[in-house]
Amino acid sequence: MSRAELDKNPRDVASMFDGVARRYDLTNTVLSLGQDRYWRKATRSALGIGPGQKVLDLAAGTAVSTVELNKSGAWCVAADFSVGMLAAGAARRVPKVAGDATRLPFADDVFDAVTISFGLRNVVDTQAALREMARVTRPGGRLVVCEFSTPSNALFATVYKEYLMRALPRVARAVSSNPDAYVYLAESIRAWPDQAALADQIAGAGWAGVRWRNLTGGIVALHAAHRPPR
């Protein structure tokens, strides 16, 4: 699977991530020039979580993001539909659950906060996933979506697109266990909605108070919202 225009069949997407799991964390750090660590810290800060709270880290992959969230003192569970990714993070001692973002294996209103980092773009039905996140979050609970976005500076945006389509696949061939998956990555980023459009989608799924801020010049955006009362 290497084209962003395909139907994002959950089995195909899970298989793709199973194929990159072994070197996934290293590849991400190399391709992001180390910015992935900063993005994880920013996500934890935006959630505003603390001891005694329950947090769902959706599309958690190898659970490196969950470990960062754990630094808050909250109880955090990693969920992903790629069993291979969860297995690659077996050494990270956090609870792990295999599950589809559009059919989460959790009861209603159980989490104080939910976050998804670089995973919403890969879900077959974005609105269904956002509604499921709202379902499992208590009223007043928080959502943070960390996702690739659109650089705010036009010149920077042009340079970034060139990096995505030309340099990124070449670097991936050198460090990734499945370079074709990163061709899909580049194309899916280009096809993804910008900051305002994603904010509209989040609000349309029932979340309130949607706002965003850019990281790394808009390469990544953090969208935050809260679950309104019933």
Swiss-Prot record:
Q: Name one GO biological process term.
A: methylation
Q: In which pathway does it act?
A: Quinol/quinone metabolism; menaquinone biosynthesis; menaquinol from 1,4-dihydroxy-2-naphthoate: step 2/2
**Keywords for the protein's UniProt record, in alphabetical order:** Menaquinone biosynthesis, Methyltransferase, S-adenosyl-L-methionine, Transferase
Please state the Enzyme Commission number of this protein.
2.1.1.163
Q: Do you know which InterPro entries this protein is assigned to?
A: SAM-dependent_MTases_sf, UbiE/COQ5_MeTrFase, UbiE/COQ5_MeTrFase_CS
Pfam family for this entry, one: Ubie_methyltran
Gene Ontology MF terms: demethylmenaquinone methyltransferase activity
- List the catalytic activities from the record: a 2-demethylmenaquinol + S-adenosyl-L-methionine = a menaquinol + S-adenosyl-L-homocysteine + H(+)
Q: Which PROSITE patterns match?
A: SAM_MT_UBIE, UBIE_1, UBIE_2
Residues bound to S-adenosyl-L-methionine are: 62, 80, 100-101, 117
Transmembrane in keyword set: no
What NCBIfam families does the entry give?
A: MenG_MenH_UbiE, PRK00216.1-2
As for what it does, the entry says:
Methyltransferase required for the conversion of demethylmenaquinol (DMKH2) to menaquinol (MKH2).
Q: Which family does it belong to?
A: Belongs to the class I-like SAM-binding methyltransferase superfamily. MenG/UbiE family.
Cited PANTHER family: 2-METHOXY-6-POLYPRENYL-1,4-BENZOQUINOL METHYLASE, MITOCHONDRIAL, METHYLTRANSFERASE
Which protein are we looking at? Demethylmenaquinone methyltransferase
According to its UniProt entry, this protein's organism is: Mycolicibacterium paratuberculosis (strain ATCC BAA-968 / K-10) (Mycobacterium paratuberculosis)
Whichever gene encodes this chain, its name is menG
